[in-house]
């Protein structure tokens, strides 16, 4: 019998540092692409850990891995890709669909009447895929203090503990 030493590891989802020469500005498209890449990388880490294929992770494998998960309908892995959205007055109508989504958290500040309204949505990639809301990725942003923060944690435990752990719906992965 092999004894398992229980442990955990917090898997942070964060964009790679983009090195920008001092005389150059980074465009918003490049920022959005890197934020989306960080979502893909997080999904790949969760998926490859689950499938015991971590050795296949490369610098360029994440997007292809996520596309395969979407195509094959393996939505559980997509839940690990946290998406933070920032909505303004022009995109305000998008906000309300997240208010009624049980897997999203929507907060707002300011007042619509004064034109100072901002919406802060925390959701996951599975919500966007299953509801056909991928167009909303144009609003992707880094998490701000108004966003609900999410983390992914890798637990190492024995089989008996894992069966108890996943009996709760929020932990059924």
Language-model features: where?
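A conserved ligand/cofactor-binding region detector
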Residues: 1-173
């Amino acid at each position: 019998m092999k004894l398992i030493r229980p442990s955990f590891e917090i898997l942070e989802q964060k964009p790679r540092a983009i090195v920008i020469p001092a005389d150059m500005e980074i465009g918003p498209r490049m920022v959005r692409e890197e934020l989306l890449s960080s979502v893909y990388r997080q999904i790949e880490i969760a998926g490859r850990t689950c499938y015991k294929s971590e050795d296949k992770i490369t610098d360029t494998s994440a997007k292809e891995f996520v596309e395969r998960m979407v195509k094959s309908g393996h939505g559980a892995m997509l839940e690990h890709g946290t998406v933070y959205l920032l909505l303004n007055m022009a995109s305000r109508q998008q906000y309300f669909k997240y208010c009624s989504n049980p897997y999203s958290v929507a907060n707002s500040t300011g007042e619509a009447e004064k034109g100072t309204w901002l919406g802060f949505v925390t959701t996951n990639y599975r919500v966007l895929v299953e509801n056909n809301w991928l167009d909303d990725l144009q609003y992707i942003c880094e998490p701000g203090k108004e966003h609900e923060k999410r983390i992914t944690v890798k637990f190492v435990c024995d089989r008996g503990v894992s069966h108890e752990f996943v009996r709760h719906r929020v932990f059924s992965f």
